[in-house]
Amino acid sequence: MKAPATTLILVMSLISVLWATPDLEEGDLLAELGDLIATDDEYPMKPEERGCKLTFWKCKNKKECCGWNACALGICMPR
């Protein structure tokens, strides 16, 4: 049972080392990844663009809500 926890700790340590390791041009190795996440984060999208409404969006009926969400009290809520 110690193997999964040890693997998780090693992976997290590697990520923290990579994050802190300076790159010659950008300052750290994961700067580009951080920029990509920041620029491509489109949540929450407008419901018209998505085709359905996400959790906690206002709704009128259950067919408007995405996935397992259901319209309850005028809000898309997880079931």
From Swiss-Prot:
Cellular localization per UniProt:
Secreted
Q: Which residues form a coiled coil?
A: none
The protein's matches in InterPro entries, at most eight in alphabetical order, are given as:
Toxin_23
Q: Which UniProt keywords apply?
A: Disulfide bond, Ion channel impairing toxin, Knottin, Neurotoxin, Secreted, Signal, Toxin, Voltage-gated sodium channel impairing toxin
Query: A Pfam family this protein belongs to?
Result: Toxin_23
Q: Which residues form the signal peptide?
A: 1-20
Stated consequence of mutating residue 75 to A: Loss of activity on Nav1.2
Q: What S-S linkages are listed for this chain?
A: 52-66, 59-71, 65-76
Relate the outcome reported for changing residue 55 to A. Decrease in activity
Q: So what family is this one in?
A: Belongs to the neurotoxin 15 family. 01 (magi-5) subfamily.
Share any extra remarks. Answer: The primary structure of the mature toxin is identical to that of beta-hexatoxin-Mr1a (Raventoxin-III) from Macrothele raveni (AC P61232).
Purpose of the protein: Insect and vertebrate active toxin. Binds to site 4 of mammalian voltage-gated sodium channels and shifts the activation voltage of the mammalian Nav1.2a/SCN2A channel to more hyperpolarized voltages, whereas the insect channel, DmNav1 (para), is not affected. Competes for binding at site 3 of the insect sodium channel. Causes temporary paralysis when injected into lepidopteran larvae at 8.6 nmol/g. A low intracranial injection dose into mice causes lacrimation, closure of the eyes and sweating. A high injection dose causes extensive lacrimation and death.
This chain belongs to which protein, by name?
A: Beta-hexatoxin-Mg1a
| Taxonomic path | Eukaryota, Metazoa, Ecdysozoa, Arthropoda, Chelicerata
